[in-house]
């Protein structure tokens, strides 16, 4: 089960979290019971819909009879308007530009918060709640979708971003990759980039969007694990 509770985020209350814990406890017990390498291998459990705040505030790690062999996983797709939102809504605009030096003057698509300091604060929460207590943390997914001038609003022929400044958008994606990678590592969390063929050619192993990969590598070099 990936991102448990994801289909009903607005209603992930105590009963739902209890169900997630029961499911994960069953998983752990079943794996350990098979013996062999499974008796001691590292296992990964996910916090409620892999959300940092839910995992920090509402989640308790399941029990494992084997000490120091459980890891916790979260995902990072914040802010949603920058990483996943694909067209403007009545409640808000798509963020095409992210980071203090990447805003476009006069644009309605600049990020309004949830930038560098927010990323640091979120990973600090995971460090305090888990990594500092000896519980390994992985960021099992993180990425921000690519937008182009040719993108259309889903189900229509209308252009979604006709006025996009592609250079600044690319810089924003690269910088987001850099900041998230760096801050995850600095706060003791191991990041795994979610790549489905948009940034890499899986057939040749070459970069399709070199700037995005360069952002990851820059963040990886700058981020030093604290342990």
Where are these regions (language model features)?
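Active-site region of glycoside hydrolase catalytic domains
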Residues: 1-115, 124-145, 186-189
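Well-ordered, non-membrane alpha-helical segments in soluble/globular domains
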Residues: 20-26, 119-120, 170-178
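Aromatic-rich peripheral "rim/lid" segments of glycoside hydrolase catalytic domains that contact
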Residues: 64, 149-227
């Amino acid at each position: 089960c990936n991102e448990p509770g994801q289909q009903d985020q607005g209603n992930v209350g105590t009963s739902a979290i209890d169900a997630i814990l029961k499911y994960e406890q069953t998983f752990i017990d079943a794996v350990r019971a098979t013996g062999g390498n499974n008796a001691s291998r590292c296992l990964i459990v996910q916090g409620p819909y892999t959300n940092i705040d839910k995992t920090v505030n509402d989640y308790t790690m399941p029990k494992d009879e084997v000490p120091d062999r459980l890891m916790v996983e979260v995902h990072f797709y914040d802010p949603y308007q920058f990483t996943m939102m694909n067209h403007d809504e009545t409640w808000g605009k798509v963020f095409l530009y992210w980071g203090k030096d990447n805003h476009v003057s006069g644009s309605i698509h600049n990020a309004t918060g949830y930038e560098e300091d927010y990323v640091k604060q979120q990973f600090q929460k995971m460090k305090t709640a888990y990594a500092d207590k000896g519980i390994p943390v992985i960021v099992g997914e993180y990425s921000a979708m690519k937008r182009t001038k040719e993108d259309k609003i889903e189900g229509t022929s209308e252009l979604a971003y006709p006025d996009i400044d592609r250079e600044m958008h690319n810089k924003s994606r690269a910088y987001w990759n850099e900041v998230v990678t760096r801050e995850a590592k600095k706060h003791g969390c191991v990041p795994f980039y979610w790549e489905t063929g948009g940034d890499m050619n899986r057939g040749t192993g070459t970069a399709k969007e070199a700037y995005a990969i360069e952002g990851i590598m820059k963040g990886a070099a700058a981020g030093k694990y604290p342990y």
